[in-house]
Each structure stands twice: as structure tokens, then as C-alpha cells.
């Protein structure tokens, strides 16, 4: 409900990006990679403000080329591999109207290592492989548009909450906004809302909390 009106679906996209690692995890050379990521972010801001189709195509080609170069520095799926290495299963997440939940099933003797990875992951957001992740988000959007239940729910929420984000925007966002993403807005949203007083950790199972 707190996603900016001009970039709906932002919270859900951020959820995806938090599986891409951190400054330490998911890269072979963070200093080089962050330069390329900043170039991509800057180009997306220009892209969003450009209406001329030929100019947009040229900018997108630049984004595509730099994204490819940046992908050579990144280590894909390293977060997932780090969780598998400690015996974790069920790595997942979902975004709803009021919260985003991240889920792991971890061995009781790996709680400390799990916490160490999370303590690095959440504050050190890296919008790594941002360009290619759009494809996964588009696919989710397409699946939702083909789902009658979801379509009915969107219409119902729009009727019930005509002046509230519950009804004026959807969790996954509009096609227009997905086609014109803002890495800058995602970073700012993360800095504002992914803070200790907005987060909680719920744990259950055979472990010693002390």
C-alpha cells in the first residue's frame, strides 16, 4: 500500500531483488559492478522520462548492453546456494497489500549462520541483474491477467476502495509501470521502509532462542 503511485508494483519487485545478494554475496568484484549498476539506474530514469519511441529504443539498447556486461561480474543465485549450503529448504517470499514475507526452513544448528546472511542481505540491497528479473515479473503479471479469480478480485477491490491503494493499485503493478521501472524509487523505498521498526522475525521449531 506504500508503493509510489507512479511506480506501482515496486514493493513486489524489491522482494525479487532481495534474492540477488549484497555487496559481499553475489559478485566477483563489487567495486566494478556498482559502477555498471549505477549507469543502468541512470539510464532507466532517462528512459522513463522519454516518450519518443526511437529514442527509447536506443536507451533500452544501452541498458541491455550494460546489463550484459554487469551480469558477467555477478554470481547468479548465490543467495540461494548459500542457503542450500546450510541445509535450508523452502526459500521463498511473497508480497501482499500490507507486508512482504520472506520464508526459510533452516536446520536448528544453522540459525547463527542464517542470521549472519540475513543481517548482510537486508541492509545491503543491490539491484543486481535488475534488467533480466523484469522477465520473471512480467511472467507473473501475465499469469495474473489470465487468472479469472485475480481479475475479479482486482475489480472488487477497486470498487470497495476507490480512494485507497488497496483499490487504486495492485501488488504486482500495472503493465505501464513494469515497462518503465525506477531503480531509484526502489532504493528510496527500501531505505525508508526496510528499517528495524518495520520488521520482525518469527521463528518456530526445535532450537534454543538463548
Predicted regions and their residues:
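Charge-rich, well-structured scaffold segments of protease-associated domains
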Residues: 27-210
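Active/ligand-binding-proximal structured segments within catalytic/core domains
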Residues: 1-34
Amino acid at each position: 500500500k506504500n508503493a509510489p503511485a507512479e511506480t506501482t508494483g515496486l514493493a513486489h519487485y524489491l522482494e525479487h531483488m532481495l534474492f540477488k545478494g549484497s555487496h559481499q554475496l553475489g559478485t566477483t568484484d563489487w567495486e566494478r559492478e556498482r559502477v555498471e549498476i549505477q549507469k543502468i539506474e541512470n539510464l532507466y530514469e532517462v528512459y522513463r522520462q522519454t516518450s519518443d519511441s526511437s529514442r527509447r529504443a536506443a536507451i533500452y539498447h544501452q541498458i541491455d548492453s550494460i546489463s550484459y556486461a554487469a551480469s558477467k561480474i555477478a554470481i547468479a543465485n548465490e543467495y540461494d546456494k548459500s542457503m542450500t549450503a546450510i541445509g535450508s529448504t523452502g526459500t521463498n517470499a511473497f508480497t501482499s497489500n500490507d507486508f512482504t514475507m520472506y520464508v526459510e526452513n533452516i536446520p536448528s544448528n544453522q540459525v547463527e549462520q542464517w542470521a549472519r546472511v540475513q543481517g548482510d542481505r537486508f541492509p545491503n540491497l543491490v539491484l543486481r541483474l535488475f534488467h533480466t528479473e523484469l522477465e520473471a515479473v512480467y511472467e507473473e503479471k501475465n499469469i495474473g491477467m489470465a487468472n479469472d479469480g485475480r481479475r475479479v478480485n482486482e475489480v472488487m477491490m477497486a470498487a470497495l476502495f476507490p480512494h485507497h491503494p488497496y483499490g487504486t493499485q495492485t501488488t504486482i503493478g500495472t503493465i505501464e509501470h513494469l515497462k518503465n521501472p525506477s531503480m531509484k524509487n526502489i532504493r528510496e523505498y527500501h531505505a525508508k521502509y526496510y528499517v528495524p521498526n518495520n520488521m520482525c522475525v518469527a521463528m518456530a521449531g526445535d532450537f534454543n532462542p538463548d
